[in-house]
């Protein structure tokens, strides 16, 4: 019976062949196939738009979402592939592509169970994440899973199960050392680009720090976005190893080394949803740290009224979960709670943040003091937890390494090994927002500031973002610049400016303070 079923499947596949054609349509990394409504395959299989179909060519198979089209732009005997589908399938122009129904997804029953408030275990999360990593989930499926886990819907046991499932489907690097240090910031604080300073300081002191970083999810720039302005970050594991062996560290995009492929897929859908829950955050961060071969990890927890973590209580809760899950998967997790009431540095957006980083490394007069001090404190913690400095001696060592140029030399070496230090792009369109009155800056809304920078084009447009001119506690006069919007397109500048004008003031100016 089984042999007959396989034979029937092969016969059906042979009769459901269309010619591969590259459409050039960018579907944001979701594989999509376009087929004529009146093509023989659609008619014989009863395919409709949003159907999940399996495409097979030359022994390679992927699952894609079907879009049914009318009109003559697509030939009747052609399967039009989106850019993502074309790259994933690896088909050649005109190559026969077999189109069949995708296998049923049993793991979706676990997603539905989570939607209705049920708890999931290792087996259920393992099945879901395995299907996610294999590309079997559509963006609709992914959005449902992400939403079902959002907020406080993952308890500690579920967070651990999700973390282990993410580690299981990716590669894991073994550096052959008992001590490999790392850091992560939970985010929510614009301009907090300390990693690009901490890595060269720490590695200049002899510790190994292979830093895999993420791109922005809900922020105007992730560490990988900012580093990419200065040097290539899309390195594979052999290239990453070479950089680390020669310099002691690296700053690369985690998605390019396939350490947690399921997380990279989830992040792609989390970004437009603007969702980033605690359980998913913990699983995302720690799965990548474990996969990257880290043993000791420092977590930066900025706390502020408009940061991602809004209270000391929330920071303690998140920190506790990070340490408990980290301990369960063999990581030593250390915490530092930092001030998250206002942006760090002056620039918000990849190129503007990179400019601030270079200023600190080079010790120029324009270097933001707050970015410098924050990075030194974090580097000091890592130097002490890694044994490169005695307890209480980390700050002195970090300060010396930054001041005498060793950190700048190390950063240049890392950039060179990753592909070369690049010059910074500049935005073509700027608009300065001025203070409406005289007084003191008593509040800065980090969330609105980050949103405005995103609407201006960051991080997609690397030069886009915001330059901040005033800090908390500063006294400003009416008409004095508060911040400047940077955009690479006039439409994006207008869009961001419209947002700023329609919302409550990002900078609160109080006259009687």
Curated annotation (Swiss-Prot):
InterPro entries: Glycosyl_Trfase_fam3 (IPR000312), Glycosyl_Trfase_fam3_N_dom (IPR017459), Glycosyl_Trfase_fam3_N_dom_sf (IPR036320), Nuc_phospho_transferase (IPR035902), PYNP-like_C_sf (IPR036566), PYNP_C (IPR013102), Pyrmidine_PPase_CS (IPR017872), Thym_Pase_Put (IPR028579). Its EC number is 2.4.2.4. GO terms for biological process: pyrimidine nucleobase metabolic process; pyrimidine nucleoside metabolic process. Keywords: Glycosyltransferase, Transferase. One of its GO terms (molecular function) is 1,4-alpha-oligoglucan phosphorylase activity. It catalyses: thymidine + phosphate = 2-deoxy-alpha-D-ribose 1-phosphate + thymine. One of its GO terms (cellular component) is cytosol. PROSITE patterns: THYMID_PHOSPHORYLASE. HAMAP family: Thymid_phosp_2 (MF_00703). Belongs to the thymidine/pyrimidine-nucleoside phosphorylase family. Type 2 subfamily. PANTHER family: THYMIDINE PHOSPHORYLASE (PTHR10515:SF0). This is Putative thymidine phosphorylase 2.
């Amino acid at each position: 019976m089984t042999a007959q079923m396989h034979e029937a499947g092969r016969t059906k596949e042979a009769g459901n062949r269309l010619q591969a054609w590259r459409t050039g349509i960018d579907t944001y990394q979701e594989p999509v196939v376009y087929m004529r409504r009146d093509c023989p395959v659609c008619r014989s299989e009863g395919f409709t738009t949003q159907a999940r179909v399996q495409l097979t060519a030359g022994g390679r198979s992927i699952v894609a979402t079907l879009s049914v089209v009318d009109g003559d732009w697509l030939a009747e005997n052609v399967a039009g592939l989106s850019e993502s589908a074309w790259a994933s399938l690896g088909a050649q122009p005109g190559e026969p592509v077999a189109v069949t129904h995708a296998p049923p997804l049993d793991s979706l029953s676990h997603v539905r169970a989570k939607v209705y408030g049920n708890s999931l275990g290792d087996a259920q999360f393992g099945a879901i994440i395995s299907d996610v990593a294999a590309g079997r989930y559509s963006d609709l499926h992914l959005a449902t899973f992400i939403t079902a886990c959002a907020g406080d819907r993952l308890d500690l046991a579920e967070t651990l199960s999700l973390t282990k499932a993410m580690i299981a489907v990716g590669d894991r690097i073994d550096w052959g050392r008992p001590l490999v240090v790392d850091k992560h910031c939970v985010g929510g604080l614009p301009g907090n680009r300390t990693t690009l300073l901490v890595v060269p300081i720490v590695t200049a002191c002899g510790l190994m720090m292979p830093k895999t970083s993420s791109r922005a999810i809900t922020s105007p720039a992730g560490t990988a976005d900012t580093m990419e302005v200065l040097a290539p970050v899309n390195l594979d594991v052999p290239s990453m190893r070479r950089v680390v062996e020669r310099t002691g560290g690296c700053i690369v995009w985690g998605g390019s080394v396939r350490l947690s492929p399921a997380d990279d897929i989830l992040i792609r859908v989390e970004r437009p949803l603007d969702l980033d829950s605690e359980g998913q955050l913990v699983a995302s961060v720690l799965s990548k740290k474990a996969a990257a071969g880290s043993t000791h990890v420092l977590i930066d927890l900025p706390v502020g009224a408009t940061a991602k973590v809004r209270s000391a209580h929330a920071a303690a809760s998140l920190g506790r979960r990070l340490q408990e899950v980290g301990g369960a998967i063999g990581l030593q997790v250390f915490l530092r709670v930092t001030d998250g009431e206002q942006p760090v540095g002056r620039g918000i957006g990849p190129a503007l943040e990179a400019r601030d980083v270079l200023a600190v490394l080079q010790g120029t007069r324009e270097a933001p003091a707050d970015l410098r001090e924050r990075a030194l404190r974090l580097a000091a913690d890592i130097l002490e937890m890694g044994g490169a400095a005695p307890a209480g001696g980390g700050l002195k060592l970090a300060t010396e390494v930054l001041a005498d140029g060793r950190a700048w030399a190390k950063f240049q070496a890392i950039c060179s090994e990753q592909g070369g230090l690049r010059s910074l792009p500049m935005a073509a369109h700027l608009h300065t927002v001025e203070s409406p009155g005289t007084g003191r800056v008593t509040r800065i809304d980090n969330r609105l500031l980050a949103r405005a920078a995103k609407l201006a084009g960051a991080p997609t447009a690397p030069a886009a973002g915001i330059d901040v001119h005033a800090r908390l506690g500063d006294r400003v006069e009416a008409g004095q610049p508060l911040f400047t919007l940077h955009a690479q397109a006039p439409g994006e500048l207008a869009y961001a400016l419209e947002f700023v004008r329609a919302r409550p003031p990002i900078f609160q100016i109080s006259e009687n303070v």
